[in-house]
Amino acid sequence: MDSPAHGQLAAPSAAEDATAAPRRPALTPGGGRSRGAVAAPRCEHLAAAEPQGGAQAPGTDSAPGQDRVEGLLLGLAAGDAAGWPAARHRAARMPEWTRRLTRELDTFAEQNATTTLPVPIALNQPPEPLRLGPSDDAEWAAFAAETVLTGFGELFAGLPADRRTRAAVDLAWNTLAGEIAAAADRAPEVESAVLPLRARISVRAGLGNLATGLRPPATGHDNPHYFDDAACVRAVVLAVVHPGRPHAAAELAEFDARYTQDGDGVHGARAMAAAVAAALGGADTGAAVEAALEQLPDSTEIGRNAAHAVKLARDFADEPAGAFALVPLLEHQIVDHVYSYGIAAAETVPVALALTVASGGSVSAAVPAAACLSRVADSAPALAGALTGALGGGAAVPAAWRDACRTLAGCALPRLAGTDLVELAGLLARTLAEADHNSR
């Protein structure tokens, strides 16, 4: 089935091209996995059924309970808020001059050798955007949640159950690409276009590739940040479609990840989806992490890092300060300080898995420890929070964090401003429960 048309799409901008990092040697997408021809028609891209195989976690194929879905979303949001980059992301809602002034103060500190470093500022503006709260990761997670709801809505009611979510994923990405193309068409030049979102380099590049007519897996493979963890944040939410079925969740996560990632970026999404699906199905911490490890090939950087990180974590699992005690080891043996950005899935996913083990699945222990790893604080705390939140449920997230993190600011996806994650979790749980009931 073809998705609805989305209008004329534009080529990626020169500004996007300027962000490109040196490309690693091209690999067969997904280490040999294939969805068919790179330029396959949309109907062929959606044709593959969501697989039924793979090891099953404890529990059944029934819909996940609202408490675990709530824990997943609130844990992710709390982790997102806990990392220092959240304030930078939320500052996007402040007037541009406030961010310019912060940059100027940073330059002043560098040139004058001062150790008083600037932080995001409000000055004479309302400071609400700079208060503790979720930022980009939580908003892209909500984007994935909306996609799930669309898949189980009336639009795709005529499709087989195993194709509905995939059709919704395809529609979501092409709609977004169409919105960006329309914004570019309205601007006198592409660089001055007012875009309807803020996103990772991999997502912007993937959307640009869609705009030129490419299809997955090319949109993720021909991508300067194919290795980042942007798809992992979406993957943990897509896992709600397959509670207790890690392999099926991993396959769905890969389908989505191929729009923006390749290589370790895809492997990381598969791993996080498998772990969360296991947790939603009732698996304990060890089984959930093992489900993730099963998705990571030994020959990959992410596979080697994850195996090593989890081995380190198991040595600290019985210590009262296990997760916090593990931080220096992860900093020195897993986290890389060479590249410009700390968003490689080969680092953030192993960190999240290791801290889940070392904390015994406690969101209150895993998230603060992940936030201590400043290099990967943009997403590792969110990933750790999502998994431990799914393991512990909504009640495991402290009330103060729940209150501070349940409402989205709209700093990455402005249309989501005001979205209540508790209400979204309830809607997801009810929708999936109804679909499960109707399928019996």
Language-model regions, residue ranges each:
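Structured, active/binding-site neighborhoods that engage oxygen-rich ligands
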Residues: 2-440
